[in-house]
């Protein structure tokens, strides 16, 4: 009997651990303004070489739970951000370098740093170019001498992105392995990290896909999820399936399986050098987080936490005004167990909230099926005219602590999350008493994204058999997939 009880407790512990959603524990760091994409990440009017600024921002990242820093590149267009012997410095002589400022702060806080050994020229570096490979090695030689004995030095990041369409080419694998071999010779036991893209168009079931992964001489692959890049109109469902498939391959590959989730969206058209990266809605980011965790990733890092999430009141503000602070606040609220974000996390995780009879409105609003980030998903119920009404029959009088409604937002097709919901309770289904009205502030960076969110009325302390929900929107169509009553 005791053995059976112990087994059940172990199983419960295992299931609980499996359900835990790992937060974002790492961020990429980019020093250089390269084009319009970097307008908020690497502002041209801000001194990106200021060591005090970097010490402050790294400390703020540590406060929010980031313990892994990935320096994308140490040089760009002939300017180096460390004391390089063969390239002009990108910071004033006599001042501590940005790389040293980051390493010093990371040392003091127990953080880990991966250093990128580029750019030989610029962001268009090509691993088939002998000059690029040789310059990367030269960077690596100096960086190893300067930083490899630091407590925070965790390894190398090879910044030239490989593409998985349809799988990594032989020359991409060979280029990575040449740099990796030099890294292992210089710093035995130190890890090598890459962050390739292209899963949306990968031929994952092709044996050559698995072979290209297994042929890589790296320790960590942090796959770009490409949700921010919007490689597909509605990328979330496919992204989660692709990560699941790749996770199965990594069980055999002996390489750490990381996710690099893109927490940005665009202020104009995607994937060009003339649009600016801006913070995405946290509802979208949370769906990405849950998805890659369900695939079994070892860690979650992001391009990019620095500047897309920014601590309110920082002496060195970064990112898009107001909304970088708002994304930071939403993320920290989720980390601290905010009920709204907890319910949305549970929805993404597939929790069974049960079903009830709907006496007014579509029965699909309480059938246990939640809509994907796609307005064409069959789970969505559409309401026009700016108003949604439904009545849920709980079957008998019950205590009611919270009511949540799951909505879709897709600006390009006129789908807008309502401005508020009103919750009313009744014992007979005819006479209702209003118990709470909750307003919703929509996210402004919505030019491209489709995402879902919950409007939650909690701490109701109500009792009744019937629950009436009314949602109001001043414009656009309302799409709701489910109403949850607890």
Regions found by a protein language model. Give the residues of each.
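Aromatic-lined carbohydrate-recognition surfaces of secreted/lumenal glycan-active proteins
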Residues: 114-126, 157-161, 179-206, 223, ...
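Aromatic-lined substrate-binding rim segments of carbohydrate-active enzymes
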Residues: 51-120, 171-190, 236-239, 245
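Disordered, acidic Ser/Thr/Pro-rich linker "stalks" and the adjacent N-terminal cap
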Residues: 337-397, 408-415, 437-447, 477, ...
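Aromatic- and acid-rich polysaccharide-binding/catalytic face
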Residues: 151-164, 197, 206-237
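Active-site groove signature of glycoside hydrolases
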Residues: 118-123, 140-170
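An active-site-proximal structural segment forming one wall of the substrate-binding cleft
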Residues: 94-109, 128-155, 292
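Substrate-binding cleft of secreted/luminal carbohydrate-active enzymes
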Residues: 225-232, 256-341
